[in-house]
């Protein structure tokens, strides 16, 4: 389906929080962007009521670069509030619907971006990953999702969740779009001190020859039978491509979820302190209150439940007397996980697992999940994110008619291996397009 009547499309799939009423004319390509990337001609709300009405005066660097390359921004995509979620069900402005089954989630938190990539032809979408927010929805929606190395793409203009974790990346139905668009959005940016001087992408020069499968990731509870069948079939496809496959020990992976949520919530609680009803978005609180009372009242009214939960968790882990016990120890665990991956990359080109342990859940199933159930669902996507390493999800099969993803993680700055892998995979595996209708 091509972009035409965006309202009719969005009424059905709810992928956009806001979209253009203009028609593209001379644009070289059409793209969308997750709604936590600022854009000067659209509201930027990051899925939160507290930012409703906020119109930034500038474009985020990745959006600016795509526009400079001739791109037309079609809209801002729905997401979990500030990126806090696995299913894009924590949005104040619409929950995106999976194009394979409207009663199921698109994944999160870049669910709207994955939905747009799956529904529209010749469309690329910018996503943002903190703990799996690009590859999870890519898996659930049957598209390609690439999260680059931390520092590869500028974060200037990104509404932060976790400063040391956030990465801007790409989602598209076409594997070739990764090769086309990653060089455009990459590069050192004077506006972002976390962006790095980086080696050039050696696209086409480095190929996937060997992969490691961590035993600890595969032995854990929660991977469904259907996903395992697709994964086993994918390993045979890799072998047919001439790739060596070997199971390895990566004992630190079991600590990735607790370490990640300590780091992520700690950073989120500081980042969200600026939203107090005085500078951004809503500014209609009760000004007769004292500051602390105003601050508490306003944030209680406009933050969603998951945002409040993560603010409280992060505030606790940073308190005097607790920071060494939790936050600083989590940073040490992150270094141990990085070392575990580096050890594997001495012998292998990538580490491979399923992207998600199950197919996209139905919304009635999500409503019955506890917060802990939701957090635990990220156990395959968190490890590459906490390390800042580039990772890629490719569609690898279907279970109960829903897409299943295969996750490749490579060493820092080795996106060229992943992009080549995506293009080779695209030739070896027939990716199904969702049957889109209005």
Give residue ranges: language-model regions:
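Short connector loops at secondary-structure junctions
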Residues: 240, 244-260, 396
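Short, well-ordered alpha-helical
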Residues: 1-60, 80-85, 194-197, 202-204, ...
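Glycine-rich, small-residue loops and helix-cap segments
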Residues: 34, 68, 185, 237, ...
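Residue-level signal for inorganic ion chemistry
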Residues: 6, 16, 178, 211, ...
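Phosphate-coordination loops involved in phosphoryl transfer and adenosine-cofactor binding
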Residues: 28, 76, 208
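Short, well-ordered beta-strand elements within core beta-sheets of diverse protein domains
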Residues: 50-54, 166-173, 315-319, 408-409
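Short glycine/serine-rich loop segments
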Residues: 67-183, 387-397, 402-405
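A short helix-breaking turn/cap at a secondary-structure junction
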Residues: 15-18, 147-234, 297, 431-437
């Amino acid at each position: 389906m091509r972009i035409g009547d965006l309202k009719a499309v969005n009424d059905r799939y709810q992928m956009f929080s806001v979209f253009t009423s203009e028609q593209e004319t001379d644009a070289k390509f059409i793209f969308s962007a997750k709604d936590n990337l600022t854009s000067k001609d659209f509201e930027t709300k990051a899925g939160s009521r507290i930012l409703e009405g906020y119109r930034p005066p500038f474009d985020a660097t990745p959006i600016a670069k795509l526009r400079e390359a001739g791109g037309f921004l079609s809209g801002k995509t729905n997401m979990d509030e500030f990126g806090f979620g696995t299913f894009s069900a924590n949005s104040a402005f619409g929950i995106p619907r999976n194009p394979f089954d409207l009663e199921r989630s698109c994944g999160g938190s870049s669910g709207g971006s994955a939905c747009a990539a799956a529904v529209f032809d010749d469309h690329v979408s910018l996503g943002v990953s903190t703990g799996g927010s690009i590859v999870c929805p890519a898996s659930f929606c049957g598209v390609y999702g690439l999260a680059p190395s931390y520092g590869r793409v500028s974060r200037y203009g990104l509404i932060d969740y976790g400063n040391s974790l956030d990465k801007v990346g790409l989602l598209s139905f076409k594997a070739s779009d990764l090769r086309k668009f990653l060089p455009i959005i990459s590069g050192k940016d004077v506006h972002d001190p976390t962006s790095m001087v980086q080696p050039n992408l050696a696209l086409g020069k480095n190929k996937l020859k060997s992969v490691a499968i961590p035993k600890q990731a595969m032995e854990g509870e929660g991977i469904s039978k259907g996903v395992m069948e697709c994964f086993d079939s994918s390993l045979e496809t890799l072998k047919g491509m001439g790739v060596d496959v070997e199971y390895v020990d990566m004992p630190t992976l079991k600590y990735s979820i607790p370490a990640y949520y300590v780091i992520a919530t700690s950073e989120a609680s500081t980042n969200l302190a600026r939203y107090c009803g005085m500078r951004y978005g809503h500014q209609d609180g009760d000004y007769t209150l004292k500051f602390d009372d105003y601050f508490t009242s306003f944030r209680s009214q406009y933050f969603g439940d998951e945002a409040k939960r993560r603010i409280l968790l992060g505030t606790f882990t940073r308190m005097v007397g607790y920071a060494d016990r939790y936050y600083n120890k989590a940073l040490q665990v992150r270094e141990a996980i990085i070392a575990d991956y580096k050890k594997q990359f001495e012998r292998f080109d990538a580490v491979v697992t399923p992207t998600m342990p199950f197919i996209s859940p139905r919304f009635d199933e999500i409503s019955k999940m506890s917060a802990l159930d939701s957090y635990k669902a990220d156990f395959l996507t968190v490890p590459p994110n906490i390390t800042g390493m580039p990772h890629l999800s490719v569609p690898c099969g279907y279970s109960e008619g829903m897409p299943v993803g295969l996750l490749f993680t490579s060493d820092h700055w080795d996106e060229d291996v992943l992009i080549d892998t995506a293009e080779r995979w695209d030739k070896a595996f027939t990716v199904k397009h969702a049957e889109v209708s209005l």
